[in-house]
Regions:
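C-terminal catalytic "cap/lid" subdomain
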Residues: 1-216
Length: 216
């Protein structure tokens, strides 16, 4: 198509809409043809509104039986940052567990909670979580606890090592560890890894990464 000119915010929305078709085409190209591919665009409303949340849950839970792989993204083309901000502020007046859904890691964690998934894999630009964010040799391979309470404490300890570091992206690590707390409480195993390693390599233990789980 042609290059789009005009108001920056509108151009960004227009390109986001075009990008969805490119993204889905890429997934269709690389996913085994025996599986169907489904695009699911979400906003904070799909997690904060009980009826919408239940509909999303049912849609996702039907996918495995129907041989479908859901590709979930934020609905950028139809979302408004200003409107979302106002809506979220209103929700925060009456409840504490408001989902913002402004970050892919937060969205992934909310999906994991919704369907109570066994495994949650979050890709990042690093190999995982470091005890010293300035030194990649300090990769934390396992964060464990005998129960969810002990595990969350271990995650908080890992977060404290990220705060105040000079390494670019360390604050992103803090956010990732915060978002995964709820899935961990639900019993999910979480992997934080680098996308140069395949899903099977990460989950199979053949890739350097951080695995977070309740020890048995």
């Amino acid at each position: 198509g042609c290059e789009i000119d005009g108001d920056y915010s509108e151009v960004k929305v227009d390109y986001a809409a075009q990008g969805q078709t490119i993204l889905m085409n890429n997934y269709r190209q690389y996913i085994d043809p025996k599986y169907s591919v489904r695009q699911i665009l979400v906003e904070h409303r799909h997690f904060n509104d009980p009826a919408k949340k239940e509909n999303l849950k049912k849609l996702l839970l039907r996918c495995p039986a129907q041989g479908a792989i859901p590709i979930i993204n934020y609905n950028d083309p139809l979302s408004s940052e200003e409107i979302d901000k106002v809506e979220l502020q209103e929700l925060a007046k009456s409840r504490k567990d408001v989902v913002h859904c402004m970050d892919n890691d937060e969205t992934a964690s909310q999906i994991a909670c919704l369907v109570k998934c066994k495994t949650l894999l979050i890709y990042t630009s690093t190999l995982g979580i470091y005890s010293d964010p300035a030194d990649e040799k300090t990769l934390i391979r396992n964060i464990t606890g005998k129960d969810s309470y002990e595990l969350i404490n271990a995650v908080c300890d890992a977060q404290s090592k990220c705060i105040g570091s000079s390494r670019v992206g360390a604050n992103g690590a803090v956010a990732k560890l915060e978002y995964i707390k709820e899935p961990l409480k639900n019993g999910s195993e979480v992997f934080i890894a680098n996308p140069r390693f395949s899903i099977s390599e990460v989950i199979g233990g053949q890739a350097p990464c951080t695995k977070i789980f309740i020890s048995k």
